[in-house]
């Protein structure tokens, strides 16, 4: 867990509290949900479950496992707070409909990972990561909207990176050697299912905060069916 990550978490948490945004960010989503939105967290959870089965739990020391998990959960908290919390709140406050909110917040999330090129990563790796994170961002938006609370997206996001690290030894890496076994299944699922389905589901997003499915303004759109 890096010092910068901890500082980022503290700063963002303090900022939202100072601005009085905690209720809007951490509270119940002010927009209705549809049954198909549950596909978002379901799709995102498949790679996590597969990696858990592949992890050699008897390999790394318990302290290493706990540190990786803690770091991953912190990443999930910070990134979701920034992109599904602050960004979504600001986009909704600007009067944008949920399709624009989902697309723009996912795009910002994806572009934030393009800075990896400054660390010397190959363009192919960065490009693949940006495409993946755009689709993943869409799935996290749907996770937040289907569960109705951002904490669900924070937890699912927080488990994604550490399970990848513990199962493969790293993230955002492209190896010349073809993966085998469960890692190959995860890679194939991500390439052929997670990314395209994430984008397809994103295109189906409708609604606007404060409105029910008919477009009528309601006091609490989150309780509308």
Enumerate the predicted regions with their spans:
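Membrane-helix interface linkers and caps
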Residues: 1-41, 145, 197-218
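C-terminal membrane module of polytopic membrane proteins
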Residues: 26, 158-225
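Membrane-helix interface segments
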Residues: 34-35, 61-62, 95-100, 125-126, ...
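Small-polar-interrupted transmembrane alpha-helices in polytopic inner-membrane proteins
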Residues: 44, 76, 98-114
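Hydrophobic alpha-helical transmembrane segments in multi-pass integral membrane proteins
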Residues: 47-52, 108-118, 164-179
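Membrane-interface helix caps and helix-loop-helix hairpins in membrane proteins
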Residues: 51-62, 118-124
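Membrane-interface helix/loop boundary segments of multi-pass membrane proteins
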Residues: 78-104, 145-149
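Functionally important transmembrane alpha-helices
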Residues: 126-182
């Amino acid at each position: 867990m890096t010092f910068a990550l901890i500082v980022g978490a503290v700063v963002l948490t303090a900022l939202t509290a100072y601005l009085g945004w905690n209720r809007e960010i951490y509270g119940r989503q002010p927009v209705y949900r549809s049954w198909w939105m549950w596909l978002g967290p379901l799709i995102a959870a498949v790679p996590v479950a597969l990696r858990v089965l592949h992890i050699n739990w008897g390999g790394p020391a318990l302290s290493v496992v706990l540190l990786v998990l803690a770091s991953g959960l912190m990443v999930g908290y910070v990134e979701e707070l920034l992109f599904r919390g602050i960004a979504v709140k600001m986009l909704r406050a600007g009067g944008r409909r949920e399709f624009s909110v989902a697309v723009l917040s996912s795009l910002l999330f994806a572009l934030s990972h393009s800075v990896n090129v400054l660390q010397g990563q190959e363009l192919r790796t960065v490009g693949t990561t940006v495409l993946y994170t755009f689709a993943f961002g869409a799935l996290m938006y749907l996770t937040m909207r289907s569960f109705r609370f951002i904490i669900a997206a924070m937890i699912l996001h927080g488990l994604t990176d550490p399970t990848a690290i513990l199962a493969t030894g790293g993230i955002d890496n492209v190896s010349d050697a073809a993966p085998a076994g469960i890692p190959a299944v995860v890679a194939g699922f991500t390439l052929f299912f997670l990314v395209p389905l994430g984008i397809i589901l994103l295109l189906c997003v409708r609604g606007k905060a404060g409105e029910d499915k008919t477009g009528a303004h309601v006091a609490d759109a989150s309780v509308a069916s």
